[in-house]
Amino acid sequence: MKLLDFEVGINHPFFLIAGPCVIESEALALETATYLKRVTEDLGINFIYKSSYDKANRTSTNSFRGLGVKEGLRILQKVKDEVGVPVLTDVHEDTPLSEVASVVDMMQTPAFLVRQTNFIQNVCKQGIPVNIKKGQFQAPWDIGNVVNKAYETGNRLITICERGTSFGYNTLISDMRGLSTMRSTGCPIVFDATHSVQQPGGNGLTSGGQREMVPVVARAAIGVGVSGFFMETHPNPNEAFSDGPNMVPIDKIDELLKTLQELDAVTKKHGFLEDSL
């Protein structure tokens, strides 16, 4: 599948969606986008910058939600213009979709809204690529129904994102078999390595996370075979306004991507025996 100006799929090197969880300021957005562009260009990785103007599903109303759609889109447009990278942001049921689609290159639907048929179809009707996050409560084989809803709009530029599965209270796990199962949809599969180690609501008024496990689950996913990675990153995750416990320090992402590139080449060189069994 051609996504923006590059090919994605299980037989192509992985692409990267990355950036801070939420847009904290114009300065941080430009700084992180510039850094990530340099790293990915040096490694030859196709890159889409991600950051949110509104986090609608925060644990507490005391948590920072974002700068709002107007200011958020202004900053994302500036990132596109000054840094020269494509941008992605997530949208919600009350989002002015056409306004967002006029700025961003790709939209993302939240995992909690994956079963909302009207929402999924309205997003896909905007005619730009959509990264659909699989619900934490959803079986891998059920995502095909969501893909069919998306395809009914005529939009075939759909990727599916695995972000972990609920496992008891405040815990997510990654069932790597699901990555293979979801490939049967024909959609490129993206693995969200940072939200997969989140501990939803685990800190009471905020979510916890195990950022030290990001490389672990990412290496496992690359062994199964994925088309892309989603990773949230920040210069100082402990000071981040949202999802700090599961974000990767930005100065560590280069090392992680190099490892994943090497493993990706080996996995895709030898093919996928499971497809013939």
From Swiss-Prot:
Pathway: Carbohydrate biosynthesis; 3-deoxy-D-manno-octulosonate biosynthesis; 3-deoxy-D-manno-octulosonate from D-ribulose 5-phosphate: step 2/3; Bacterial outer membrane biogenesis; lipopolysaccharide biosynthesis. It is found in: Cytoplasm. Belongs to the KdsA family. InterPro entries: Aldolase_TIM, DAHP1/KDSA, KDO8P_synthase. It catalyses: D-arabinose 5-phosphate + phosphoenolpyruvate + H2O = 3-deoxy-alpha-D-manno-2-octulosonate-8-phosphate + phosphate. This is 2-dehydro-3-deoxyphosphooctonate aldolase. Its EC number is 2.5.1.55. One of its GO terms (cellular component) is cytoplasm. The lineage of its organism: Bacteria, Pseudomonadati, Pseudomonadota, Gammaproteobacteria, Candidatus Pseudothioglobaceae. Its main location: cytoplasm. It comes from the Bacteria. Keywords: Cytoplasm, Lipopolysaccharide biosynthesis, Transferase. GO terms for biological process: keto-3-deoxy-D-manno-octulosonic acid biosynthetic process. It holds the Pfam family DAHP_synth_1. NCBIfam families: KDO8P_synth, PRK05198.1. GO terms for molecular function: 3-deoxy-8-phosphooctulonate synthase activity.
